[in-house]
A protein has these predicted regions:
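Conserved catalytic/switch belt of AAA+ P-loop NTPases
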Residues: 97, 150-163
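Conserved coupling/interface region of RecA-like P-loop/ASCE motor cores
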Residues: 184-216
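A short acidic, amphipathic alpha-helical/loop segment
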Residues: 46-50, 148-155
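Conserved RecA-like ASCE ATPase "motif II neighborhood" in helicase/translocase motors
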Residues: 114-151
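N-terminal pre-P-loop "Q-motif" helix
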Residues: 12-29
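Structural recognition of the conserved hydrophobic beta-strand(s) that form the central parallel beta-sheet
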Residues: 139, 161-167
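Charged, amphipathic alpha-helical linker segments immediately N-terminal to NTP-binding catalytic cores
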Residues: 1-8
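Conserved P-loop
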Residues: 34-108, 173-192
């Protein structure tokens, strides 16, 4: 089923472009949606909005590619990861959710009983778990290697909805050829439970759009 009829998607539904509508409908129609999206296209915000409507616990995961490994930075796991989840925080504000109460926290475990529905972890700490009855958002997927994506995706049960978000023109890995994003797009493209979509309209403005068009 696509986006439920008469659901305004936190006010986004009337303003969705054709590309965004296909993206949103795919999340409700398929177990796996892979989106190759430019900057400023609303990819993470729409994914989080859909996850809220789907109603399953959300696991939001990412690659701390700037550090290479979170283990070498000071602080708790939660403190190390906090600077990487800004797209999630922005998305929650857009759907009028308070991140302090939506995201599970080691510092405040009681909020789980108060409606916290999101676990935010780097792929390093997620990949050893079984991912059941959840929505899994893999953000910045272009910065995960084939091996890292494989370790994540092989943990997913059939009861989980997966949204794999990336931009194949913004790979931050030292060796871009190691990115698993494009190979996994082609690997899953023809599977009946998967849909691959693109988002190309940058809503931040002409400057951001033009900057994103530079290739090397």
């Amino acid at each position: 089923m696509p986006l439920p009829e008469h659901n305004l998607l936190f006010g986004f539904e009337p303003k969705l472009t054709d590309e965004q509508r296909k993206y949103v409908d795919s999340i409700f129609d398929n177990q796996l949606t892979i989106v190759n999206a430019k900057s400023g296209t609303g990819k993470t915000t729409l994914a989080v909005a859909c996850a809220k409507i789907v109603g399953k616990p959300l696991i939001y995961t990412f690659s701390p590619v700037e550090e290479g490994s979170l283990g070498f930075t000071p602080g708790t796991v939660e403190e190390k990861e906090s600077k990487y989840i800004q797209p999630l925080l922005d998305a929650l504000v857009e759907i009028r959710e308070d991140p302090r109460f939506a995201i599970k926290s080691e510092k405040n475990p009681d909020i789980i009983n108060e409606g916290a529905w999101i676990t935010a972890k780097s792929h390093t700490f997620v990949r050893g778990t079984n991912i059941k009855n959840s929505t899994l958002i893999i953000d910045e997927s272009q910065n995960l290697t084939r091996g890292e994506l494989k370790k994540l995706l092989t943990r997913v049960h059939s009861s989980t909805t997966v949204i794999m978000i990336g931009h194949d023109k913004q790979i931050d890995l030292k060796d871009p050829k190691k990115s698993g994003f494009r190979p996994y797009i082609e690997h899953f493209r023809d599977e009946p439970y998967c849909n691959v979509v693109e988002l190309n309209i940058n809503f931040r403005g002409k400057l951001a759009q033009h900057a994103d068009n530079l290739e090397w």
